[in-house]
């Protein structure tokens, strides 16, 4: 699934309004199709792009038909149209490449789209449209990497997922797309990562009680050894108390993300990376 409807259509900003053409009627149908697509009227867009393809052979029409299929989740049909446009080259090739990356994202393979988008942004670092697509892809990577419950709650269940979310959020913010939704999402991801790395006791009540008892045992043993004048008892109290305290910390002190992952384990329906 794509992150947002605009991921289908934003790439059309890259098309100049004064593209040359030798078939006025075909161009007219293409303009109507593009307008319908941008308005979300997919049936009208498909009809008009179809008329255009019967009157002319233009790769942008293939991109447009691919976008209709993309919006409807027909990944194979969309990819076929984008590949045709890519093979034709010209101004449509860039849009076709972007379309192919969106197919990968829609198929749940967002990580596979990152390399090509990073190359595009490296070639044109000041292009806001390309930066937007890269940021959106990174957000999809973060979504697809996490585990998911039946009600579509995303849960970090591995250290790798934690690192991916952090990397994605930082990259989104450095791209400075100006998209409020993406920026808020990235900031939320960073907060989730920070919260996930916090240490906590699990289960808290038992851990705290055992820690208190262990410290008390150590103090009592040391005091008793001192009153008895036995250095051996004092040393034993210190060593045993320290060992027990270490064991409690090792057993019960966990990062928040691990604790939540354990709590949600029975509800996970799709595991992440």
Question: Where in this protein do the model-derived segments appear?
Answer:
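Short, flexible helical or helix-coil boundary motifs
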Residues: 9, 193, 197, 268-272
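Generic low-polarity alpha-helical segments
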Residues: 1-15, 165-172, 182, 269
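A residue-identity detector for tryptophan
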Residues: 5, 12, 75, 138, ...
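Long, contiguous interaction/recruitment modules in multidomain scaffold/adaptor proteins
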Residues: 1-21, 238-248, 273
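Transmembrane alpha-helical hairpins and terminal membrane-anchor modules
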Residues: 199-264
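N-terminal topogenic membrane-targeting module
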Residues: 21, 25, 29, 262-273
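Membrane-protein extramembrane domains
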Residues: 20-197
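Enriched - but not universal
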Residues: 8, 15, 78, 141, ...
């Amino acid at each position: 699934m794509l992150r947002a409807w605009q991921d289908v259509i934003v790439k059309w900003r890259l098309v100049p309004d004064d593209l040359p053409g030798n078939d006025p009627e075909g161009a007219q149908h293409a303009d109507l199709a593009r307008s319908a697509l941008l308005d979300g009227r997919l049936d009208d867009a498909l009809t008009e792009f179809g008329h255009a393809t019967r009157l002319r052979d233009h790769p942008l029409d293939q991109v447009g038909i691919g976008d209709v299929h993309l919006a409807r989740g027909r990944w194979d049909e969309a990819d076929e149209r984008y590949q045709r446009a890519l093979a034709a080259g010209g101004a449509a090739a860039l849009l076709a490449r972007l379309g192919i990356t969106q197919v990968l994202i829609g198929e749940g393979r967002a990580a596979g789209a990152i390399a090509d988008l990073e190359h595009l942004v490296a070639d044109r670092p000041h292009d806001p449209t390309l930066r937007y697509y890269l940021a959106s892809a990174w957000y999809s990577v973060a979504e697809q990497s996490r585990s998911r419950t039946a009600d579509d709650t995303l849960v970090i269940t591995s250290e790798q997922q934690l690192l991916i979310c952090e990397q994605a959020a930082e990259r989104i913010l450095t791209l400075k797309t100006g998209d409020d939704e993406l920026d808020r999402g990235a900031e939320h991801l960073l907060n989730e990562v920070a919260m996930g790395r916090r240490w906590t006791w699990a289960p808290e009540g038992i851990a705290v009680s055992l820690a208190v008892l262990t410290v008390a045992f150590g103090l009592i043993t040391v005091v008793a050894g001192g009153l008895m004048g036995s250095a051996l008892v004092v040393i034993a109290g210190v060593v045993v108390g320290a060992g027990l305290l270490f064991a409690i910390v090792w057993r019960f002190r966990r990062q928040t993300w691990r604790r939540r992952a354990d709590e949600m384990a029975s509800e996970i329906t799709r595991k992440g990376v």
